[in-house]
């Protein structure tokens, strides 16, 4: 199929989403003010939300990785290494919360340690996988809240032609998109929007 900047999967097993949501409730007490990529600081004019971090050693990491690979095979065909930082962001957006227009990655690279594919675990000195500069290539967001349980909070994208479009709000929808795509989370008007968010790194663009 032709390359699309976003890839959506809306038919993930609902029973798995329910199990996932129940299992990660233990991370609710770890929620803290969300920071902004780049300067690693709280910037309420840019982003207002709370999040905790779930290590990819958790079974959810491998489960999501399976679908990331599926999206990559079917659409992107990028060279990928692993989930950035070995963690997945578990995010809560309460009434009044938002994330303004931003991108998750560009052509700039950052040093990453050697990591074991699909786990986020650092490799031992006697193992080799990759080392050095990496770039964020794909971003993903898994909708955990029923659309009827909150108003606002839409994930909105804008393409190179200036056209805007929204991701599906259906619970259990996995959205995978090119990290260079401009997007935002619109202000939540009521209720609570929960999601799992992460980024996938690979070698520098060629």
Regions found by a protein language model. Give the residues of each.
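Fe(II)/2-oxoglutarate oxygenase catalytic core
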Residues: 1-174, 180-206
């Amino acid at each position: 199929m032709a390359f699309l900047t976003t890839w959506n999967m809306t038919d993930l097993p609902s029973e798995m989403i329910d199990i996932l949501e129940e299992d990660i409730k233990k991370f609710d007490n770890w929620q803290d003010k969300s920071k902004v990529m780049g300067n690693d600081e709280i910037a309420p004019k840019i982003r207002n939300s709370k999040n905790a971090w779930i290590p990819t050693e958790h079974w959810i990491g491998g489960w999501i990785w399976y679908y990331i690979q599926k999206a990559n095979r079917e659409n992107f065909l990028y060279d990928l290494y692993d989930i950035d930082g070995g963690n997945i962001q578990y995010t809560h957006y309460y009434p009044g919360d938002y994330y303004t227009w931003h991108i998750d990655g560009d052509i700039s690279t950052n040093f990453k340690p050697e990591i074991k594919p699909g786990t986020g675990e650092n490799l031992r000195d006697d193992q080799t996988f990759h080392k050095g500069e990496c770039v964020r290539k794909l971003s993903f967001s898994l909708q955990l809240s029923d659309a009827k349980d909150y108003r606002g909070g839409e994930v909105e994208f804008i393409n190179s032609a200036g056209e805007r479009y929204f991701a599906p709000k259906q619970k259990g929808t996995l959205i995978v998109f090119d990290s260079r795509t401009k997007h935002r989370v619109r202000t939540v008007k009521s209720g609570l929007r929960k999601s799992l968010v992460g980024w996938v790194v690979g070698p520098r663009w060629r």
